């Protein structure tokens, strides 16, 4: 399992355990699974998907380290 935390300027959007996270990277969509290599990347407009949930975003950043995934995003309203 992954520990996922998604924050926006307004609030904490989600925190909890998930199987995987799909994100809209600036070089294309990609998926984070358990034991993924450490990573820092920018995100572009699109949809973050995790455990059947979808969160539309305008952009942001992702950090992956030791099965902990942190996203700092600007929400699309």
Name each model-derived stretch.
Residues 2-77:
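Compact, glycine-rich, soluble single-domain proteins
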